[in-house]
Design a protein with these regions (language model features):
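A short linear hydrophobic-aromatic micro-motif
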Residues: 18, 153, 229-232, 263-268
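PLP-dependent enzyme catalytic core of the Aspartate aminotransferase-like
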Residues: 108, 248-249, 253, 257-261, ...
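Short acidic capping loops at alpha-helix termini that bridge into adjacent secondary structure
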Residues: 16-20, 40-43, 88, 120, ...
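PLP-dependent aminotransferase class I/II
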Residues: 150-234
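PLP-dependent aminotransferase-like
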Residues: 7, 36-94
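Conserved PLP-binding catalytic core of the aspartate aminotransferase-like
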Residues: 72, 216, 228-261, 277, ...
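Active-site pre-lysine segment of PLP-dependent enzymes
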Residues: 78-87, 100-123, 127-158
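Phosphate-binding glycine-rich loop
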Residues: 3-43
Length: 298
């Protein structure tokens, strides 16, 4: 049951253990939410350019995905979410910051949104990239749990904590929501090595601060080059930047050129952004390698 990791999370964030569920990555938590609360024919709302897993887990359990039109800056349009709520709506996925756009919703807007959503609809707030945010932008979602029993917050150790290969994440919600999810969860879904590493990482604030600093520096490095080359990009609050090459053919040409030179970027056609690529922010030398081959093809 992950006793010691739950204890560490309780001490870190002033939570109770019955508010926490552990997952084989936060992806597991998202899937557990879908399997627990969605039945065949139920509707699930998420943004058009949101994390692909939302659609995958919705379809896997027989749910119907309802895509909300994004804002002009590709961010979540919460007013559109509200318009799409119907009698069949059972769950809403919101990523903040969002993948692959890197956009961020202001805390005040999320708080106002929560107050308008019917209480029987579960709201899953995916905060996998929260550790990359500046202190003034960081989530205060845990403080909303007392008022909103229909809120589930998912977090990950795969990003700023650097434990992606170990597969460890967690969800935080009301004890009622967590109890229902635990009935669906496989009893041994998280291995002991991942739990031990996660406990250690929770105590290593210096590493998180360093990771955020390096990420901030790398983001500025890449943004400067995109501005120089007049390449459109989405200002990002995560550890990646999505940039637009104008059309799908050109995006594929750049993708293949970079790949041949040992630089792996992400095609995001499946996010309905066919002319865009997403590049992860790396160390300075890694970013320089990307920049070198980006410029050599421009």
């Amino acid at each position: 049951n992950g006793y010691y990791l739950k204890l560490a999370l309780c001490n870190k964030f002033s939570l109770n253990s019955d508010q926490i569920i552990l997952g084989n990555g936060s992806n597991d938590v998202l899937e557990l939410a879908a399997r627990t609360f969605i039945s065949t024919g139920d509707e699930v709302i998420y943004s058009k350019h949101a994390f692909a897993v939302y659609e995958i887990v919705t379809k896997a359990v027989g749910g119907i995905g309802v895509k909300a039109k994004p804002q002009e800056d590709f961010g979540h349009n919460l007013d559109e979410f509200l318009k799409l709520i119907s009698e069949k709506t059972k769950l809403i996925f919101i990523a903040n910051p969002n993948n692959p756009t890197g956009s961020l919703i202001e805390k005040s807007k999320i708080s106002a949104f929560l107050s308008k959503v019917p209480k029987h609809i579960l709201i899953v707030l995916d905060e996998a990239y929260d550790e990359y945010l500046r202190d003034e932008d960081k989530s205060i979602a845990f403080s909303w749990l007392a008022e909103y029993k229909n809120l589930l917050i998912s977090r990950s150790f795969s990003k700023a904590h650097g434990l992606a290969g170990l597969r460890i994440g967690y969800g935080v919600g009301s004890k009622e929501v967590i109890n229902l999810m635990n009935r669906v969860r496989q009893p041994f879904n998280v291995n002991s090595i991942a739990q031990t590493a996660a406990i250690a990482s929770l105590d290593d604030d210096d590493f998180i601060i360093k990771s955020r600093l390096i990420n901030d520096q790398g983001r500025l490095q890449l943004e400067e080059v995109f501005n120089e080359l007049k390449i459109e990009y989405i200002p990002s609050y995560g550890n990646f930047i999505s940039f637009n090459l104008g059309d799908e053919t050109k995006a594929m040409m750049y993708y293949q050129h970079l790949l041949k030179n040992g630089v792996i970027v992400r095609l995001i056609q499946n996010y309905e952004m066919p002319s865009w690529l997403r590049v992860s922010i790396g160390l300075k030398d890694e970013n320089n390698t990307f920049i070198k081959y980006l410029k050599s093809f421009t």
